[in-house]
Curated annotation (Swiss-Prot):
Protein name: Synapse differentiation-inducing gene protein 1-like
Positions in the Cytoplasmic compartment: 204-228
Membrane-side (Extracellular) residue stretches: 1-182, 250-258
One GO CC term on file: membrane
Record keywords: Golgi apparatus, Membrane, Transmembrane, Transmembrane helix
Encoding gene per record: syndig1l
Domain of life: Eukaryota
Record family assignment: Belongs to the CD225/Dispanin family.
Pfam families reported in the protein's UniProt record: CD225
Xref: InterPro entries: CD225/Dispanin_fam
Membrane protein topology class: Multi-pass membrane protein
Subcellular location: Membrane; Golgi apparatus, cis-Golgi network
Major location category of this protein: membrane
Regions crossing the membrane: 183-203, 229-249
Length: 258
């Protein structure tokens, strides 16, 4: 095949009068009657030549002018071109220069794309041409804010010891019953000022009774009263004894009494 028309129509005879001109494909739109006439002439007289593009493994029967059937070889790769001959062409094939202009037109076009991203993501992705080591350094420069505080363990320990001492004193106050001061009350009653000693002995017995009943507040009050009266009885008794001794010495020191 030496021309573009043979490439486009391999089944047509080289001597056919309906060959395509020059470097163009379908030259334009044909009238319907002329187009049908071309198809009929293709099947009636087109097979008289050497059979277009040879090489296919099949054939088709074509009736010649003398009424005899003649086999014509077909090219399997060019059958679609023969099928297109049955339809009216609606397009025009241009030369290669037009395709070159189309390529230039495509090259001149610019494509714009819209990307929906956050500002932070855009800022991170824009310096793609920069050095990756500089990017890593920028990431390492990011400061992380931390909050630190110190716990003063010494004050906490002191506070804990104070609480423990208070609790221990309260426990001791509750566990240890108040003293009745019975011995001191008896001494004050017998050896000192006996009226106050008797009163101290009375409160001492009241303290022991309150402890047995479990009434510790009342027992503590009675114990304090017994201690106070016993001490007062001893003080008064001591004063009485000292006064008696002084009076006796003064009386005996006079000269008329010997």
């Amino acid at each position: 095949m030496e021309s573009l028309s043979e490439l486009q129509n391999p089944l047509l005879d080289k001597n056919s009068k309906h060959m395509v001109m020059a470097d163009y494909g379908y030259g334009g739109d044909f009238h319907s009657n002329q187009y049908q006439e071309n198809i009929i002439n293709y099947f009636v007289t087109g097979g008289g030549g050497g059979g277009g593009g040879g090489g296919g493994g099949g054939g088709v029967a074509v009736t010649g002018g003398n009424g005899k059937a003649k086999s014509q070889l077909l090219d399997a790769t060019s059958l679609h071109l023969a099928v297109e001959a049955f339809y009216k062409p609606n397009f025009i094939l241009y030369k290669d220069d037009v395709s070159g202009k189309g390529k230039d037109y495509k090259n001149e076009c610019c494509e714009t794309t819209f990307m929906e991203k956050k500002d932070k993501e855009v800022v991170v992705e824009t310096p793609s041409t920069e050095d990756p080591q500089a990017k890593l350094l920028d990431e390492n420069d990011v400061k992380i804010q931390t909050v630190s505080y110190e716990v003063e363990e010494e004050e906490y320990v002191e506070y804990e010891t104070d609480c423990s001492s208070d609790s221990e004193s309260e426990d001791n106050f509750i566990v240890i019953p108040p003293r009745d001061h019975l011995g001191l009350a008896i001494f004050s009653m017998l050896c000192c000022f006996w009226p106050l000693g008797i009163a101290a002995f009375y409160f001492s017995q009241g303290t022991s009774k309150a402890v047995t009943k479990g009434d510790f507040p009342l027992a503590s009050i009675a114990s304090r009263r017994a201690l106070f009266l016993a001490a007062l009885s001893i003080t008064i008794g001591t004063g009485v004894y000292v006064g008696v001794v002084v009076a006796l010495i003064a009386y005996l020191s006079k000269p008329g009494h010997i």
